[in-house]
């Protein structure tokens, strides 16, 4: 029943008569949800009174105008003007139009604050980006917004609350507020400069490396900024070490100048792309969780916001990328066997078997059928289906999974595991696997996980590894969240902004998606679909998992893709590694995961 003391507007009539003209550019689902919302309110407005916008509208509009500070675009939200006539109040039609359009703008902001600009990353960008924004249903969003005492505060609450999102946001604000004096100034060619010398470039190098000018006593001579002192020398050596510049000494060289002239500062687009990814992350990462950041090639165990363990990892090749997703680790397996994936059976082993060879010999592989050992020479491979044979590598020093693996069941069938190919961890770009993540010191990771989950000691872990049973599955008492991420920009606790290479091209795809340049995005082929030319459909254990195939999955009637070229220098890095690797380690690249 309408309240005689409240304002009611003919909003239903406005929706029925004006949608095709004045509301056609707004999201249809937003319009439909808003019409039902106002119908339930009998046309009672939120934002206007008889004289114009009320205080709730003022709070909402003020916050929406700050959208750029949150990684959104303020110009995308069309805030309707509501000018008061010279005499009297605005008419009902003007009030109704302002009310509805402001609500629609607020709904758009609310959706996009939660990540709706790219609402299906796995289909819009790449099937490897298995993330989905945590959107709020439109009716719930409207109810919460209308009930919130502070409308601006409610809009702010919709953004990610992760500390890293806020750190990136502050970097974005600072970047946009930088003055002309902060422009990147290149260091020209010059002579070698050693410690103790004076040269005008020293002051420029000092600023680039953020080394402060020494403070002198009041009665001492003013310090010459061109003097090459010990503090700067230490920073130069650290920079050379970090950037692989040889020899590592304090001498200023052309190689050092060239490295210092690389403007590695991320642009706004890179910051925005990383902020957007945080909108896709779970709101609760877990009190203790594992994070594998692909561009950084690093796995971390994080407890109560602090890193308690960190280690290097090897990730998937460009052609067999490690997917980006979250799931729950449930099992740690000590002394695991490796079950050869069906794709490798058919594409790698079967041709050699049919040619009369024995590709299992020398690689530590064994074969069974129906639980019984089988000799490859006793099988007519022209007639038999190799998929009916269990080909595996028993536990041992040469096993491609090493001595431990960490399972978090997922549709991509990837996991963390050990590897005998330890030399790969010395590479700077470590994209060498079939999709799984190899850990440099997996026993230490197991020790941390088991200490947190079961209170086990290092001695207990060593006992399991040394004398425990093979394929020893140890279920975790409490499943542990695992977040595989793709952050190319990260702000450290000290405020330092670190950047990492866009090894799979996802950062570029996100940039283009945020700018609406969808036709410029080159997608990866959907790695979960059967390959076009393979003899069989790709099954779940194609990645090396032993869990059996997934339910059948049909190919969409219309599916097209363009193969994307790998990032610059990717082929050279792969070729460089293969030239210097041994034959056995190279075979681990073919048969390992």
Q: Positions of the model-derived regions?
A:
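Well-ordered beta-sheet/strand-loop patches within structured domains
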Residues: 1-28, 100, 104-108, 127-132, ...
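Cationic-aromatic interfacial patches
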Residues: 1-134
């Amino acid at each position: 029943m309408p309240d005689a003391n409240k304002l009611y507007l003919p909003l239903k009539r406005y929706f029925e008569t004006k949608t095709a003209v004045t509301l056609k550019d707004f999201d249809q689902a937003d319009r439909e949800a808003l019409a039902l919302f106002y119908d339930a309110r009998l046309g009672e407005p939120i934002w206007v009174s008889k004289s114009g916008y009320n205080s709730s509208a003022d709070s909402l509009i003020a916050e929406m105008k700050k959208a750029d500070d949150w990684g959104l675009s303020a110009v995308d939200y069309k805030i309707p003007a509501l000018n008061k006539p010279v005499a009297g109040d605005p008419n009902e039609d003007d009030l109704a139009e302002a009310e509805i359009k402001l609500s629609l703008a607020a709904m758009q902001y609310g959706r996009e604050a939660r990540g709706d600009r790219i609402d299906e990353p796995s289909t819009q960008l790449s099937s490897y980006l298995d993330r989905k924004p945590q959107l709020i249903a439109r009716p719930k969003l409207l109810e919460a917004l209308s009930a919130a005492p502070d409308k601006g505060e409610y809009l702010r609450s919709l953004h990610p609350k992760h500390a890293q999102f806020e750190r990136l946001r502050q970097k974005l604000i600072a970047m946009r507020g930088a003055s002309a004096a902060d422009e990147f100034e290149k260091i020209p060619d010059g002579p070698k400069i050693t410690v103790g010398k004076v040269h005008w470039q020293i002051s420029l190098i000092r600023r680039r490396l953020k080394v402060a000018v020494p403070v002198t006593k009041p009665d001492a001579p003013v310090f010459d900024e061109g003097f090459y002192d010990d503090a700067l020398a230490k920073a130069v050596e650290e920079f050379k070490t970090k950037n692989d510049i040889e020899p590592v000494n304090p001498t200023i060289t052309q190689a050092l100048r060239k490295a210092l002239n690389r403007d590695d500062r991320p642009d706004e687009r890179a910051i925005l792309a990383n902020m957007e990814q945080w909108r896709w992350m779970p709101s609760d990462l877990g009190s203790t969780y594992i994070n594998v950041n692909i561009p950084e090639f690093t796995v971390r165990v994080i407890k109560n916001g602090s890193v308690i363990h960190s280690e290097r990892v090897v990730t998937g090749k460009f052609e067999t990328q490690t997917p980006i997703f979250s799931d729950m680790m449930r099992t740690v397996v000590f002394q695991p066997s490796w079950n050869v994936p069906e794709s490798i059976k058919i594409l790698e082993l079967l041709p050699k078997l049919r040619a009369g060879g024995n590709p299992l010999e020398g690689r530590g592989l064994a074969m069974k059928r129906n639980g019984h050992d089988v000799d490859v020479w006793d099988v007519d491979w022209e007639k038999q289906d190799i998929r009916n044979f269990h080909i595996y590598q028993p536990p041992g020093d040469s096993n491609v999974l090493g001595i431990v693996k960490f399972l978090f069941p997922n549709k991509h069938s990837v996991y963390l595991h050990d590897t005998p190919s330890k030399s790969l961890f010395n590479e700077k770009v470590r994209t060498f696997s079939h999709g799984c993540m190899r850990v440099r010191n997996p026993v230490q990771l197991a020790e941390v996980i088991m200490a947190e989950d079961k209170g086990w000691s290092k001695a207990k872990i060593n006992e399991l590894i040394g004398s425990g049973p093979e394929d020893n599955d140890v279920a975790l008492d409490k499943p542990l969240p695992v977040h595989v991420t793709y952050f190319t920009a990260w702000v450290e606790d000290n405020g330092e902004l670190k950047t990492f290479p866009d090894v799979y091209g996802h950062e570029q795809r996100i940039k283009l998606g945020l700018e609406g340049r969808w036709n410029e995005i080159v997608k990866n082929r959907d790695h979960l679909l059967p390959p076009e030319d393979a003899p069989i459909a790709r099954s779940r254990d194609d990645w090396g998992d032993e869990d059996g195939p997934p339910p059948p999955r049909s190919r969409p009637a219309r599916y097209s893709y363009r193969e994307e070229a790998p990032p610059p220098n990717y082929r050279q890095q792969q070729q460089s590694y293969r030239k210097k690797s041994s034959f056995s380690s190279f075979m681990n690249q073919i048969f390992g995961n």
